[in-house]
Amino acid sequence: MSLEEQQSDDPAELESGVSRGDELAELLGDLVVGREEHLNAPGLVIRPDEVQDALFKLRDEAGFDHLSCVTAQEYEDRYESIYHLTKFDDRTDEVSVVVPTSKDNPVSQSAEPVFRTADWHEREAYDLVGIQYEDHPDLRRILLPETWQGHPLGLDYDQDRPQIATLREHANPLEEDHRAGDSNTMYINIGPHHPATHGVLHVETVVDGEQVVDLESDIGYLHRCEEQMCQQGTYRHQIMPYPDRWDYISSGLLNEWAYARAAEDLADIEVPEYAQIIRTMGAELCRIASHMIALGTFALDVYGDFTAIFMYAMRDREIVQNILEDLTGQRMMFNYFRLGGVVWDLPEPREEFFEKIRDFMDGLPQALEEYHDMITSNEILQARTVGTGVLSPEVAKSYGATGPVARGSGIDYDLRRDDSYGYYDELEWDVVVEDGCDNFSRLLVRMREVEESAKIIQQCVDLLEDWPEDERNIQANVPRTLKPDEDTEIYRAVEGAKGELGIYIRADGTDKPARFKIRSPCFSNLQTLPEMSEGEYIPDMIASLGSLDIVLGEVDR
């Protein structure tokens, strides 16, 4: 897409004829030293020593209160950090703050004083690309061991060089701080192999008696540089299998849609309406399966309920998994989406497939009523969740929390409605929000979202049943080899089961991305754990971790 086309089709064009980029550039004044045009947003180039001034102005005067993610990359002549900003109350209003730094001295101001979520995102940028961030409170590696040599996404990184890092060499600042001076506290390792972490997560915890006084999540045990793997694959054929492995529990189609949406907008591919309905139905089935396992494992964590809620939830999830297997041919790693549509039509005989879905939907209201009864009448669960793990809306926004974590704190934000895609804007459903801001509210959001997903699925089934046979077009006409224009950039996101799952792609004119960035909702949501846990008891911290519903494959990528 040419620059002229980008400007004429700019969704942020104002009635006065002044573009959104011009308006924001005028607001920032001399802070802006250049302009770029990304497909999703205007790009404002800022000096590396004026990042905080620019971000404070955009947040406080223009209302950009959501830092979605930070993309770092290396060019032949410079390094670059991109801060993807938007608003919780207007998701379609976006701006990219582009911060170039020199090859000889890749140092930039940290955004952490403005947005707390920049803490982990900038640590990841330093870890994988090598950019230094001044004023960062704790700039060290986050996904790789501290003793790792080089930065894997750098242009001169030697991928063939073997490296070994022992546990003894792995830095643990929290333990050192605890041991310094006189202290009555105790240091506890929770994980990396522990049932309550639901994956390979190391929660470094300092306690005073039974109360948590300090906490840090040590991640990266499942890191395999998925972004680099996607950069080595072709748009058309080789990238799509990877998203299934990020949130590998139940959210495969939701993950695939994140990549599909970004690549389709990048290459200007229009998906047929029939395929969009199939995508929407499949995505909501995945959402139900994901929320069911979140509900069951949360009850298991909080009061050891293995026989009732946990097994009931796993039973219902199993029914959904069987439906998804009928649809995609795979039980877990679906690889069902294709750029421009889906790989094949609904299974035959269609009547049996629809009947299986309807049977499950007919029994779902009674099942959810039983879940509600078991949860609201359980005194142990109520005591452990109501008023614990409190996350205020202001703190949640600063950390970039999204999905049920944000909506459980009263933040009315859902990309299916606020930046609609697929077939969601044609269907009747509601965004679920709870204002309790605690562990119980996050649990209720997921249970109520299952009801809304069921509404969406039923409407999709009704549409698909009556769809004329000669109009069942499952794929657009997509070139065998996709080569988007050089230096075309885009960030697109979908509403995953855990929150905002976003993809940034920069094209270089070849059939492979020059940069592929994954914005993981679990990565941002996990940052909030210390805010929810410090001052609470250890069992409450376990409940707070469970209420985040993280999957380590998506956190570590």
Curated annotation (Swiss-Prot):
Cross-link (Glycyl lysine isopeptide (Lys-Gly) (interchain with G-Cter in SAMP2)): 517
Keywords: Cell membrane, Isopeptide bond, Membrane, Multifunctional enzyme, NAD, Quinone, Translocase, Transport, Ubl conjugation
Subcellular locations according to the entry: Cell membrane
One Pfam family per UniProt: Complex1_49kDa
Enzyme class: translocase
Presence of the UniProt keyword Translocase in the record: yes
Biased composition (Acidic residues): 1-13
Region (NADH dehydrogenase I subunit C): 1-174
Gene3D superfamilies listed in its UniProt record: Cytochrome-c3 Hydrogenase, chain B (1.10.645.10), NADH:ubiquinone oxidoreductase, 30kDa subunit (3.30.460.80)
Sequence segments annotated as region (Disordered): 1-20
EC number(s) recorded for this UniProt protein: 7.1.1.-
UniProt GO MF annotations: NAD binding; NADH dehydrogenase (ubiquinone) activity; quinone binding
Predominant subcellular localization, coarse grouping: membrane
Ranges for region NADH dehydrogenase I subunit D: 184-557
Catalytic reactions on record: a quinone + NADH + 5 H(+)(in) = a quinol + NAD(+) + 4 H(+)(out)
SUPFAM superfamilies: HydB/Nqo4-like (SSF56762), Nqo5-like (SSF143243)
Stated family: In the N-terminal section; belongs to the complex I 30 kDa subunit family.
Subunit structure, interactors included: NDH-1 is composed of 13 different subunits. Subunits NuoB, CD, E, F, and G constitute the peripheral sector of the complex.
UniProt name for this protein: NADH-quinone oxidoreductase subunit C/D
Species of the source: Haloferax volcanii (strain ATCC 29605 / DSM 3757 / JCM 8879 / NBRC 14742 / NCIMB 2012 / VKM B-1768 / DS2)
